[in-house]
């Protein structure tokens, strides 16, 4: 194909126009914790995550996985480097603007569901909307009820957390994370407090919601089976990020201590 200056441009060059938009980008991300001595955790992490991706972050305990997730969620600040969320450098935002960013653009799922015992499942799921807007609209309420029905809680939404199982509570937490229709969902060991069967069910729901919502999901996990089912696998090792293919991840798992699901 001829270019504007008469040169021939190959037709098979990769096109960025067809790629989903970047929702997370970090450059030179560093984090050092200061106590009696400086403890460096992240050493110049460069990362790009696009809308609709499902990314698993693996690594040994203490490698910085959760620290990275907290920085991506604007819950912590890096020592150096930049974080862009939906093309906004979050270092330029005020505290109020950061709070709005977290409310509007990012959903969080934690290992422990953190549902409030005094509220019903529906009220807990609506909590991000209530905090953001003061009161939900009929359309927002209907959407959240629809999500609860889709995750199998259509007949449970009136119950309180202590009346539901751990898996049901975590399903409610997934709906809560999606309540404000965020572009990014960050999950820190979302199945770590569940038995294997419940964990696999919760993960399957997360994958389904990822596909249907188009939100980018970023999940920290020690479960190599779940990491294998993600779209991408990122290893945090010695404070550095490295992309792992599935074959390499399986090989690392087999060469670990022999335990299944706890290799990272």
Residue locations for each model-derived region?
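ABC family nucleotide-binding domain
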Residues: 21-238
């Amino acid at each position: 194909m001829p270019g504007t200056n008469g040169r021939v441009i190959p037709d098979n060059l990769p096109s960025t126009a067809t790629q989903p938009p970047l929702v997370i980008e970090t450059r030179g991300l560093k984090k050092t914790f200061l106590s009696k001595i400086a403890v460096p955790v992240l050493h110049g992490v460069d990362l790009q995550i696009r809308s609709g991706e499902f990314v698993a972050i693996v690594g040994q305990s203490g490698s910085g996985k959760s620290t990275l997730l907290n920085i991506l969620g604007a819950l912590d600040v890096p020592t150096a480097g930049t974080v862009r969320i939906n093309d906004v450098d979050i270092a330029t935002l005020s505290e109020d603007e950061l709070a709005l960013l977290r409310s509007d653009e990012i959903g969080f799922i934690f290992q422990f569901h953190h549902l409030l015992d005094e509220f019903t499942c529906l009220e807990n799921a609506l909590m991000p909307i209530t905090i953001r807007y003061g009161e939900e609209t009929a359309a927002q309420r209907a959407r959240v009820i629809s999500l609860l029905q889709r995750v199998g809680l259509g007949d449970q939404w009136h119950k309180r957390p202590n009346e539901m199982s751990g898996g049901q509570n975590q399903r409610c937490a997934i709906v809560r994370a999606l309540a404000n229709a965020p572009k990014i969902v960050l999950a820190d060991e979302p199945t770590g407090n569940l038995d294997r069967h419940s964990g696999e069910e919760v993960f399957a729901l997360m994958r389904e919601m990822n596909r249907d919502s188009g939100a980018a999901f970023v999940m920290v996990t020690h479960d190599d089976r779940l990491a294998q089912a993600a779209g991408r696998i990122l290893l945090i090792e010695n404070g550095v990020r490295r992309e792992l293919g599935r074959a390499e991840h399986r090989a690392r798992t087999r060469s670990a201590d022999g335990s299944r699901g706890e290799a990272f």
